[in-house]
Amino acid sequence: MTTPGTDHNADQGADSGDKATKAASGAQTEREVLLVAHTGVHENLGLAAEAASRLQKGGINVRVMATADPAPVARHEVLGRFKRFGHTKEAATGVEMVIVLGGDGTFLRAADIAHSADVPVLGINMGHIGFLAEWEQESLQEAVDRVIDRDYRIEDRMTLSITARDMDGRVLGTGWALNECSVENLNRQGVLDTILEVDERPVSSFGCDGVLVSTPTGSTAYAFSAGGPVLWPELDAILVVTSNAHTLFSRPLVVSPNSMVAVETNPSTSPATVVMDGFRQIHMPPGARVEIRRGPQPVRWVRLDSAPFTDRLVHKFRLPVTGWRGPRH
């Protein structure tokens, strides 16, 4: 999320005079990126090889990480020549950025690595909607050239910090999320009895299939499908959306980013699970609770596109705007 003072240029605040001085003195450090590709799609291998070769020709060393089966990468005549890593923090440690070729699922897994190493992440869409991606595969070459030329900027996106506790207050697990944290019922034959809490005060109790707590970035994902509003990414807020709640009060809530949201389950209800960004999980026995706060560390988001979020929303969801005439001055 963009906040005052958090935007950087690609040289982390260095002005043109500083860059000229560094270039003249030969003091520039060696550049390296981590390239993450969804290898489950054959076409992605060729595009990843194209990107890796172009980055290397541009003077940037490349590491490669496969989110699915690593074997196709190892066997590939081009990608097999680069250093290969698994899903570990070390894969992104010390790199300039993580470049992701894939859909939103691949992006979220790569963001997990980038966040752990505190390095920026750039998404290039190879999926369908790909709302988290900054660029489309048709312009892959341009995106790579922009990285080589350091023609990008970085903005911070808000995250969530999650702690699950049992009935006695013991910590069951911790985690974080870029998109959302969902509390989901494990018993598909009944409802999950919960009570929603904001800033240590009860809001409402209800039976439901689950509760979603989302960032503005995640408001276009699972929360949107559950009937939540779209929040502009520049907004600092926490979004709460219930899933099939059995209550008259089931409207989405938008609360302060400084608030703590908690979802507590009834001791006699079903077990549940906390799912973060669709793939990190914490088991919740009956009577457990999950506490969600603003995360202390944002995700550093690489921006290439200068178009406003409104245009992005219209394009990604193919919203009809026929007949719009614009403001009159």
From Swiss-Prot:
Q: What biological-process terms (Gene Ontology) are attached?
A: NAD metabolic process; NADP biosynthetic process
E.C. number(s) listed in UniProt: 2.7.1.23
Disulfide connectivity for this sequence is none
Q: Does the keyword Cell cycle apply?
A: no
What keyword terms does UniProt attach to this protein? ATP-binding, Cytoplasm, Kinase, NAD, NADP, Nucleotide-binding, Transferase
> Where's it found, cell-wise?
Cytoplasm
Gene Ontology molecular function: ATP binding; metal ion binding; NAD binding; NAD+ kinase activity
Name the SUPFAM superfamilies on file. NAD kinase/diacylglycerol kinase-like (SSF111331)
Q: Which reaction does it catalyse?
A: NAD(+) + ATP = ADP + NADP(+) + H(+)
Query: Which cofactor does the UniProt annotation name?
Result: a divalent metal cation
Where do the catalytic residues lie?
Answer: D104
Q: Any one cellular component term from GO for this entry?
A: cytoplasm
Q: Which family does it belong to?
A: Belongs to the NAD kinase family.
Please state what the protein is called. Answer: NAD kinase
Q: Which organism is it from?
A: Corynebacterium jeikeium (strain K411)
Whichever gene encodes this chain, its name is nadK
